[in-house]
Amino acid sequence: MGSLFGRVAALRALLCGPRFQCLLVRPSSGGPPWPQERTLVAVKPDGVQRRLVGTVIQRFERRGFKLVGMKMLQAPESILAEHYRDLQRKPFYPALISYMSSGPVVAMVWEGPNVVHISRAMIGHTDSTEAAPGTIRGDFSVHISRNVIHASDSVDGAQREIELWFQSSELLNWADGGHHSSCYPA
Protein backbone atom coordinates (compact mmCIF):
# COMPACT_ATOMS: atom_id res chain seq x y z
CA MET A 1 0.00 0.00 0.00
CA GLY A 2 2.79 2.46 0.78
CA SER A 3 2.89 5.36 3.15
CA LEU A 4 0.86 8.51 2.67
CA PHE A 5 4.10 10.41 2.04
CA GLY A 6 5.13 7.87 -0.60
CA ARG A 7 1.77 8.12 -2.36
CA VAL A 8 1.90 11.93 -2.38
CA ALA A 9 5.47 11.81 -3.70
CA ALA A 10 4.39 9.37 -6.41
CA LEU A 11 1.55 11.66 -7.48
CA ARG A 12 3.88 14.66 -7.51
CA ALA A 13 6.36 12.70 -9.65
CA LEU A 14 3.55 11.74 -12.02
CA LEU A 15 2.33 15.31 -12.39
CA CYS A 16 5.76 16.92 -12.48
CA GLY A 17 7.80 14.29 -14.33
CA PRO A 18 9.15 15.02 -17.79
CA ARG A 19 6.52 12.86 -19.50
CA PHE A 20 3.68 14.83 -17.92
CA GLN A 21 5.31 18.25 -17.79
CA CYS A 22 2.37 19.62 -19.77
CA LEU A 23 0.10 18.93 -16.80
CA LEU A 24 1.53 21.92 -15.04
CA VAL A 25 2.99 24.29 -17.62
CA ARG A 26 1.94 25.67 -20.99
CA PRO A 27 4.03 24.99 -24.07
CA SER A 28 6.36 27.79 -25.06
CA SER A 29 4.79 30.44 -27.25
CA GLY A 30 6.96 29.30 -30.15
CA GLY A 31 5.87 25.66 -29.95
CA PRO A 32 2.82 24.03 -31.45
CA PRO A 33 -0.40 24.15 -29.42
CA TRP A 34 -1.59 21.01 -27.67
CA PRO A 35 -3.93 18.94 -29.80
CA GLN A 36 -7.52 18.78 -28.62
CA GLU A 37 -8.52 15.32 -27.46
CA ARG A 38 -11.72 13.78 -26.19
CA THR A 39 -12.10 11.13 -23.52
CA LEU A 40 -14.89 9.13 -21.98
CA VAL A 41 -15.38 9.51 -18.24
CA ALA A 42 -18.08 7.50 -16.49
CA VAL A 43 -19.21 7.82 -12.91
CA LYS A 44 -19.96 4.25 -11.89
CA PRO A 45 -23.04 3.13 -9.91
CA ASP A 46 -21.33 3.57 -6.51
CA GLY A 47 -20.32 7.13 -7.42
CA VAL A 48 -23.85 7.99 -8.56
CA GLN A 49 -25.36 6.40 -5.44
CA ARG A 50 -22.97 8.38 -3.23
CA ARG A 51 -23.90 11.61 -5.09
CA LEU A 52 -20.38 12.29 -6.39
CA VAL A 53 -21.37 13.27 -9.94
CA GLY A 54 -21.25 17.02 -9.22
CA THR A 55 -17.88 16.70 -7.51
CA VAL A 56 -16.45 14.84 -10.51
CA ILE A 57 -17.81 17.42 -12.96
CA GLN A 58 -16.42 20.24 -10.84
CA ARG A 59 -12.92 18.73 -10.80
CA PHE A 60 -12.86 18.39 -14.59
CA GLU A 61 -14.23 21.90 -15.13
CA ARG A 62 -11.72 23.41 -12.70
CA ARG A 63 -8.99 21.66 -14.67
CA GLY A 64 -10.15 23.63 -17.71
CA PHE A 65 -11.75 20.80 -19.68
CA LYS A 66 -14.94 21.24 -21.66
CA LEU A 67 -17.95 18.95 -21.24
CA VAL A 68 -19.26 18.09 -24.72
CA GLY A 69 -21.62 15.22 -23.90
CA MET A 70 -23.31 13.74 -20.86
CA LYS A 71 -26.08 11.28 -20.09
CA MET A 72 -27.34 9.16 -17.24
CA LEU A 73 -28.36 5.64 -18.14
CA GLN A 74 -28.86 2.15 -16.89
CA ALA A 75 -26.05 0.64 -18.94
CA PRO A 76 -27.27 -2.15 -21.22
CA GLU A 77 -25.39 -5.41 -20.91
CA SER A 78 -24.52 -5.22 -24.63
CA ILE A 79 -22.61 -1.95 -24.11
CA LEU A 80 -20.92 -3.26 -20.98
CA ALA A 81 -19.87 -6.49 -22.73
CA GLU A 82 -18.27 -4.51 -25.55
CA HIS A 83 -16.75 -1.93 -23.20
CA TYR A 84 -15.11 -4.61 -21.05
CA ARG A 85 -14.40 -7.09 -23.87
CA ASP A 86 -10.70 -7.29 -22.94
CA LEU A 87 -11.65 -8.50 -19.46
CA GLN A 88 -14.09 -11.25 -20.51
CA ARG A 89 -11.70 -14.07 -19.54
CA LYS A 90 -10.94 -12.62 -16.10
CA PRO A 91 -12.51 -14.36 -13.09
CA PHE A 92 -14.04 -11.08 -11.87
CA TYR A 93 -15.79 -10.32 -15.19
CA PRO A 94 -19.30 -11.56 -14.19
CA ALA A 95 -19.18 -9.55 -10.95
CA LEU A 96 -17.98 -6.47 -12.88
CA ILE A 97 -20.87 -6.66 -15.34
CA SER A 98 -23.33 -7.25 -12.49
CA TYR A 99 -21.98 -4.25 -10.58
CA MET A 100 -21.94 -1.94 -13.62
CA SER A 101 -25.56 -2.84 -14.39
CA SER A 102 -26.69 -2.55 -10.74
CA GLY A 103 -27.53 1.15 -10.97
CA PRO A 104 -27.28 4.22 -13.15
CA VAL A 105 -24.03 5.34 -14.75
CA VAL A 106 -23.29 8.94 -15.76
CA ALA A 107 -21.29 8.88 -18.98
CA MET A 108 -19.51 12.04 -20.06
CA VAL A 109 -17.26 13.15 -22.89
CA TRP A 110 -14.65 15.73 -21.95
CA GLU A 111 -12.53 17.69 -24.40
CA GLY A 112 -9.23 19.46 -23.96
CA PRO A 113 -5.50 19.37 -24.51
CA ASN A 114 -3.99 16.06 -23.37
CA VAL A 115 -7.29 15.23 -21.65
CA VAL A 116 -6.78 11.45 -21.86
CA HIS A 117 -3.54 11.36 -19.86
CA ILE A 118 -4.50 14.15 -17.50
CA SER A 119 -7.85 12.56 -16.67
CA ARG A 120 -6.10 9.27 -15.86
CA ALA A 121 -3.83 11.15 -13.45
CA MET A 122 -6.85 12.92 -11.96
CA ILE A 123 -8.79 9.73 -11.25
CA GLY A 124 -5.88 7.83 -9.69
CA HIS A 125 -4.92 4.18 -9.40
CA THR A 126 -7.62 1.54 -9.98
CA ASP A 127 -6.96 0.05 -6.53
CA SER A 128 -8.19 2.55 -3.95
CA THR A 129 -5.46 1.49 -1.51
CA GLU A 130 -2.87 2.64 -4.07
CA ALA A 131 -4.68 5.80 -5.22
CA ALA A 132 -2.95 8.98 -4.06
CA PRO A 133 -4.81 11.55 -1.96
CA GLY A 134 -6.07 14.35 -4.16
CA THR A 135 -7.12 11.97 -6.92
CA ILE A 136 -10.80 11.13 -7.31
CA ARG A 137 -10.28 7.51 -6.31
CA GLY A 138 -7.84 8.46 -3.56
CA ASP A 139 -10.43 10.78 -2.06
CA PHE A 140 -13.64 8.78 -2.64
CA SER A 141 -13.04 5.13 -3.56
CA VAL A 142 -13.59 2.53 -0.87
CA HIS A 143 -12.71 -0.72 -2.67
CA ILE A 144 -11.07 -1.85 -5.91
CA SER A 145 -14.41 -3.20 -7.15
CA ARG A 146 -16.28 -0.01 -6.18
CA ASN A 147 -13.87 2.62 -7.43
CA VAL A 148 -16.27 5.42 -8.40
CA ILE A 149 -15.09 6.31 -11.90
CA HIS A 150 -13.81 5.15 -15.27
CA ALA A 151 -11.70 7.13 -17.74
CA SER A 152 -10.35 6.01 -21.10
CA ASP A 153 -6.75 4.82 -20.96
CA SER A 154 -5.59 5.91 -24.43
CA VAL A 155 -6.59 8.19 -27.28
CA ASP A 156 -7.60 5.18 -29.40
CA GLY A 157 -9.47 3.64 -26.48
CA ALA A 158 -11.27 6.93 -25.89
CA GLN A 159 -12.44 7.07 -29.49
CA ARG A 160 -13.72 3.48 -29.32
CA GLU A 161 -15.48 4.05 -25.99
CA ILE A 162 -17.05 7.35 -27.04
CA GLU A 163 -18.45 5.72 -30.19
CA LEU A 164 -19.81 2.88 -28.04
CA TRP A 165 -21.54 5.06 -25.44
CA PHE A 166 -22.62 8.07 -27.55
CA GLN A 167 -24.19 8.81 -30.91
CA SER A 168 -22.38 11.61 -32.74
CA SER A 169 -25.55 13.74 -32.46
CA GLU A 170 -25.23 13.60 -28.66
CA LEU A 171 -21.86 15.38 -28.70
CA LEU A 172 -21.81 19.16 -28.97
CA ASN A 173 -19.14 21.37 -30.46
CA TRP A 174 -19.54 24.64 -28.64
CA ALA A 175 -17.32 27.66 -28.21
CA ASP A 176 -16.67 28.94 -24.72
CA GLY A 177 -16.29 32.51 -25.99
CA GLY A 178 -13.06 32.97 -24.09
CA HIS A 179 -14.92 32.97 -20.78
CA HIS A 180 -12.85 30.40 -18.99
CA SER A 181 -10.30 30.27 -16.26
CA SER A 182 -8.26 27.50 -17.83
CA CYS A 183 -4.49 27.63 -17.86
CA TYR A 184 -4.66 26.21 -21.39
CA PRO A 185 -4.65 28.31 -24.56
CA ALA A 186 -8.08 28.83 -26.12
From Swiss-Prot:
CDD domains: NDPk_I. The keyword Acetylation does not apply. ATP binds at residues 44, 92, 120, 126, 137, 147. SUPFAM superfamilies: Nucleoside diphosphate kinase, NDK. Keywords: ATP-binding, Kinase, Lipid-binding, Magnesium, Membrane, Metal-binding, Mitochondrion, Nucleotide metabolism, Nucleotide-binding, Transferase, Transit peptide. It is a peripheral membrane protein. Its main location: mitochondrion. GO terms for biological process: CTP biosynthetic process; GTP biosynthetic process; lipid transport; UTP biosynthetic process. This is Nucleoside diphosphate kinase, mitochondrial.
